[in-house]
């Protein structure tokens, strides 16, 4: 059986301590954001989860930051890796686990045949795969049961038919992962690499959850597909903490990774996979589970505006992308209920120019029309979204984003940042 690492500063040697000092002072090491990865693990993990490190050199650095109680698995355990032993230990030690937080570093040396990742791609659902400096931080969801495959017949010409769909559950609380299996029947070979996209949309087509990735945990790019093949394609779609309870449409499709152009079905550039019910979690998510560019902490009537993010719509992955005239400025707003019951409060967000002249404004509920603030529970954190369409003739310059909550007496408001329009 695999040995689980016992982490803690007690076991750090003098040599390791010196190495850690270099890690904190050398910018080349600082780019590997172990502190941030540990913060994510601490915010999202439950006692049913596990952590995976694939390189011995990670142990001391990771243990400096991580003080939790989750089992930390060191795999592969041998050099060179032994495939049969490694996969057997993965199956045994991850049995009954809910999620795996994997930190992959120097995989060309530690696992050149991708034994660990191949097993996870085949048995788990990849939720996130992001570089943190030289470390890949990957989150997997582990299925608790086998979901039945529903037959489909949707052609994404000329590449493939979507022949089947399996969903782990029809309803789940925010903060959980929807496990999705797509079955592709390949019709034609291609040299192009297409990504699969999955989106959870509300009635106004606002995106509340999204996953973009190459098929099969990115292990089977479409450039390797051959006519007649059947590709089992697993994806984990995280329903972010704070997503308002309600019913959402799940859609899927394929787009060219180089150009962004989508493949079409007979009548659209996506397929509707049905409705998913998002419910309120049994316990509120802690504040640490929410990523905010800017913290505000201002009470506006019966709610607190904790903070916000803003970026051009569609660029949450690159929020520094410049805004231009005619673009859509997207806002993520993080609210916390102070008390209950409350009235169904509304907000107005405006873009103000010189001398506080209002350029454009939008009004709407704090989070969603289907989950008014009157239904929030004390202490609950809810994520809202709102879009501001910038006029095509808007002069370039710096503008202020201002929010007001009209239902308060006097009317409460808050500045929510400056934006530069190019």
Give the predicted meaning of each segment:
Residues 4-138, 151, 159, 190-199, ...:
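Catalytic lumenal/periplasmic loop and adjoining terminal transmembrane helix
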Residues 112-118, 129, 208, 244, ...:
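Beta-sandwich strand segments
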Residues 144-173, 279-324:
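Low-complexity, acidic Ser/Thr/Pro/Gly-rich terminal tails and inter-domain linkers that flank the onset
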Residues 172, 186-193, 323, 337-344, ...:
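A short beta-turn/strand-edge loop motif at beta-sheet boundaries
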Residues 176-180, 194, 327-331:
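Structural beta-strand segments of beta-rich domains
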Residues 187-188, 236-245, 338, 387-396:
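Short, surface-exposed loop/turn segments at beta-strand-coil junctions that are enriched for proline
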Residues 194, 230, 244-252, 347, ...:
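A short tyrosine-centered beta-strand micro-motif
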Residues 227-236, 378-387:
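Aromatic sugar-binding surface patches on proteins
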């Amino acid at each position: 059986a695999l040995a689980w690492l016992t982490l803690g500063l007690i076991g750090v040697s003098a040599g390791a301590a010196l190495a850690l000092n270099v890690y904190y002072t050398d910018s080349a090491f600082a780019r590997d954001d172990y502190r941030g990865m540990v913060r994510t693990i601490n915010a999202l993990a439950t006692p049913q989860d596990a952590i995976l490190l694939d390189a011995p050199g990670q142990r001391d650095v990771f243990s400096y930051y991580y003080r939790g109680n989750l089992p930390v698995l060191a795999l592969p355990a041998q050099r060179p890796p032994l495939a049969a032993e490694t996969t057997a230990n993965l199956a045994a030690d991850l049995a009954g686990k809910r999620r795996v937080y994997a930190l992959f570093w120097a995989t060309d040396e530690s696992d050149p045949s991708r034994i660990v990742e191949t097993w996870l791609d085949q048995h788990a659902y990849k939720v996130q795969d992001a570089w943190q400096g030289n470390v890949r931080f990957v989150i997997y969801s582990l299925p608790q049961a086998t979901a039945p495959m529903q037959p489909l017949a949707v052609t994404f010409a000329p590449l493939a038919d979507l022949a089947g769909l399996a969903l782990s559950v029809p309803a789940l609380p925010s903060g959980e992962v929807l496990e999705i299996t797509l079955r592709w029947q390949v019709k034609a070979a291609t040299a192009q690499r297409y990504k699969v996209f999955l989106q959870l949309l509300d009635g106004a087509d606002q995106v509340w959850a999204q996953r973009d990735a190459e098929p099969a945990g990115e292990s089977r790019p479409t450039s390797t597909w051959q006519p007649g093949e059947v590709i089992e394609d697993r994806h984990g779609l995280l329903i972010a903490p704070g997503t308002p309870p309600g019913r959402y449409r799940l859609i899927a499709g394929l787009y060219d990774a180089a150009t962004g152009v989508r493949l079409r079905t007979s009548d659209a550039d996506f397929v509707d996979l049905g409705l998913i019910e998002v419910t309120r979690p049994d316990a509120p998510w802690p504040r640490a589970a929410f990523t905010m560019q800017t913290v505000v902490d201002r009470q506006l009537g019966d709610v607190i505006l904790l903070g916000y993010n803003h970026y051009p719509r569609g660029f949450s992955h690159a929020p520094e992308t410049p805004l231009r005239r005619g673009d859509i400025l997207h806002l993520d707003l993080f609210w916390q209920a102070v008390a209950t019951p409350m009235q169904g409060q509304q907000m107005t967000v405006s873009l103000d120019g010189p001398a506080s002249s209002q350029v454009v404004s939008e009004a709407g509920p704090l989070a969603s029309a289907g989950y008014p603030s009157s239904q929030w529970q004390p202490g609950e954190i809810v994520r809202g979204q709102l879009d501001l369409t910038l006029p095509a003739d808007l002069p370039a310059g710096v503008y202020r984003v201002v929010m007001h909550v009209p239902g308060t007496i006097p009317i409460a408001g808050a500045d929510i940042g400056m934006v530069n329009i190019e």
